[in-house]
């Protein structure tokens, strides 16, 4: 059975309401605080929860209290956080892998929307200090809570989370740029980007915040009616104000047995979702003989993959697009190689997620020597499915050179040896 969840938003959605539903379902505030403090913001906020009444119904209200002493220490510094800084905080926090990947994706989605509204690149979006702390706690806390509840992942690594249509709200709200119409521009852009269904419930207040919209539009699999499910628990997260109807976000937690067979009920059976960094630069004036050396230096400092693509550049000059894929912790080293060994004046950085099959190496003895076989699979025993088997290139090349025989002969002998070992083990 797959654990899935459904967000019912009769009065909209915000980050603190999401946290309220999760705490209501049993996610410990102490757990959230412990993990959030690894982001380096422990002195900037305090997280607390309480039971409140909304139109006679009890729900959980989560508060993100900003600590006054930190605000006063920094109020004259005009300090804020941009997307790359927040991404680096998340990457260095040691969060559970799914929570890390989801948090990065939500912040990227929010920055893309805000950047589109203001006509700037996502990396240039400035999160005001107070707003940034709120957003970090709300977004990362929500991702931590969904992971803690054990909600299953789909093939792309995102939670099996569903959501109702959004009420649009109405009226105006005061923001950093003055009075704004509701829904505010960032929320409208997020709805547009995802193609969300919306409707009016007649309440002229801000019902959907940018943070709440970013969480939903990034993590939700489908919008609309609830999926077929057996409800096991319902979490109730309270909004801040009283409205004509109970201002409560409801998170239904349950099970479904009607999903496609290739969607697993745990992250362990799915490809691992990991965070990678991608560097790109376009070059049209580098000696082609230098490219091979650049590759060697990049792999020496830890690049996972390096490749080039032919491109046409300005003034009709032919050039190359040089792309480097690496782990975030080796990004600076790879970037330093590019600046040192190429003629580039600028490098683009992006953070992405990739799904990686489980893999292992098995040594196989051939008559010419040992060759390591890389084996990739998905699923768990006894339903483990092997999807790829490849002899290591360098092992085959070394033996081919040593014995002066074709590389393909070594490769075929290694594969034959692996297949024979599988047959003998049955």
UniProtKB/Swiss-Prot annotation:
Coiled coil: none annotated. The keyword Cytoplasm does not apply. This is Putative nickel insertion protein. InterPro entries: Ni_insertion. Signal peptide: none annotated. Keywords: Nickel. Pfam families: Ni_insertion. Disulfide bonds: none annotated. It comes from the Bacteria. Belongs to the LarC family. The keyword Chloroplast does not apply. GO terms for molecular function: lyase activity; nickel cation binding. PANTHER family: NICKEL INSERTION PROTEIN-RELATED, PYRIDINIUM-3,5-BISTHIOCARBOXYLIC ACID MONONUCLEOTIDE NICKEL INSERTION PROTEIN.
């Amino acid at each position: 059975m797959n654990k899935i969840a459904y967000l019912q938003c009769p009065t909209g959605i915000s980050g603190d309401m999401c946290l309220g539903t999760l705490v209501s379902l049993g996610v410990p505030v102490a757990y959230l605080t412990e993990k959030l403090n690894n982001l380096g913001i422990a002195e900037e906020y305090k997280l607390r929860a309480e039971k409140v009444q909304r139109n006679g119904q009890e729900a959980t209200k989560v508060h993100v209290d900003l600590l006054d002493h930190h605000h006063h220490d920094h109020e004259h510094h005009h300090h804020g956080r941009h997307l790359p800084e927040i991404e680096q905080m998340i990457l260095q926090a040691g969060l559970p892998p799914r929570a890390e990947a989801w948090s990065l994706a939500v912040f990227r989605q929010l920055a893309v929307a805000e950047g589109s509204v203001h006509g700037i690149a996502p990396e240039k979006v400035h999160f005001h200090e107070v707003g940034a702390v709120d957003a970090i706690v709300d977004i990362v806390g929500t991702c931590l809570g969904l992971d803690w509840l054990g909600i299953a992942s789909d093939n792309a690594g995102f939670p099996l989370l569903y959501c109702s249509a959004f009420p649009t709200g109405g009226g105006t709200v005061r923001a950093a740029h003055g009075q704004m119409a509701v829904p505010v521009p960032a929320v409208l852009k997020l709805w547009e980007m995802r193609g969300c269904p919306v409707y009016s419930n007649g309440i002229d207040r801000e019902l959907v915040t940018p943070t709440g919209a970013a969480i939903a539009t990034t993590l939700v699999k489908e919008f609309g009616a609830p999926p077929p499910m057996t409800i096991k628990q319902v979490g109730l997260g309270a909004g801040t104000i009283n409205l004509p109807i109970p201002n409560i976000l409801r998170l239904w937690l349950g099970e479904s047995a009607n999903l496609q067979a290739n969607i697993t009920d745990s992250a362990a059976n799915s490809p691992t979702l990991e965070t990678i960094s991608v560097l790109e630069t376009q070059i049209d004036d580098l000696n082609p003989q230098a490219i091979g050396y650049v590759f060697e230096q990049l792999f020496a400092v830890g690049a996972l993959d390096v490749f080039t693509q032919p491109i046409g550049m300005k003034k009709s000059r032919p050039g190359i697009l040089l792309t480097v894929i690496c782990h975030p912790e080796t990004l600076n080293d790879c970037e330093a190689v590019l600046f040192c060994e190429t003629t580039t004046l600028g490098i683009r950085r992006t953070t992405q997620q990739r799904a990686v099959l489980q893999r292992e190496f098995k040594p196989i003895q051939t008559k010419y020597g040992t060759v390591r076989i890389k084996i990739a699979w998905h699923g768990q025993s006894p339903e483990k499915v092997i999807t790829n088997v490849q002899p290591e290139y360098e092992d085959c090349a070394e033996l081919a050179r040593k014995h002066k025989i074709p590389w393909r002969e070594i490769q075929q002998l290694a594969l034959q040896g692996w297949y024979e070992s599988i047959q003998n083990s049955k």
